[in-house]
Amino acid sequence: MDKIVLEGCRFYGYHGAFKEEQTLGQIFLVDLELSVDLQAASLSDQLTDTVHYGMVFDSVRQLVEGEKFILIERLAGAICEQLFNEFPPIEAIKVAIKKENPPIAGHYKAVGIELERQR
């Protein structure tokens, strides 16, 4: 299956189980892999034959920056639901969400989740 990839999208949101996360917020890193049939676009060179990744980015940004969830698992699920609703050609989605600075003690690069859904 063909794929559209958005990697390293950075958004500021207020998601998390800790009160600090819900009041102060933090940066969320989002990676998306969208399974889409790109055959027509590869032949036509027409934007109408693909999923516009700029519109995908805006859709995800509105959700991450406009909503508030306790779990990033739920945020990832909401991203999948929204993208399936807004972009019918998407057949499957893989979304990874990472927090670089959650309020937990320890040394790490990031913590996060990865979720895969099919239509």
Curated annotation (Swiss-Prot):
CDD domains: DHNA_DHNTPE
Catalytic reaction annotation: 7,8-dihydroneopterin = 6-hydroxymethyl-7,8-dihydropterin + glycolaldehyde
The protein's enzyme class: lyase
Chain sites annotated for binding substrate: E21, Y53, I72, E73
Biochemical pathway: Cofactor biosynthesis; tetrahydrofolate biosynthesis; 2-amino-4-hydroxy-6-hydroxymethyl-7,8-dihydropteridine diphosphate from 7,8-dihydroneopterin triphosphate: step 3/4
Keywords: Folate biosynthesis, Lyase
SUPFAM superfamilies to which the protein is assigned, alphabetical: Tetrahydrobiopterin biosynthesis enzymes-like
A UniProt-annotated Pfam family: FolB
GO process terms (BP): folic acid biosynthetic process; tetrahydrofolate biosynthetic process
Active-site positions on this chain: K99
Gene Ontology CC annotation, any one: cytoplasm
Keyword Glycoprotein applies: no
Lyase recorded as keyword: yes
UniProt similarity note: Belongs to the DHNA family.
Function: Catalyzes the conversion of 7,8-dihydroneopterin to 6-hydroxymethyl-7,8-dihydropterin.
Matching PANTHER family: DIHYDRONEOPTERIN ALDOLASE 1-RELATED
Protein name (Swiss-Prot/TrEMBL): Dihydroneopterin aldolase
Organism name: Streptococcus pyogenes serotype M1
Lineage of the organism: Bacteria, Bacillati, Bacillota, Bacilli, Lactobacillales
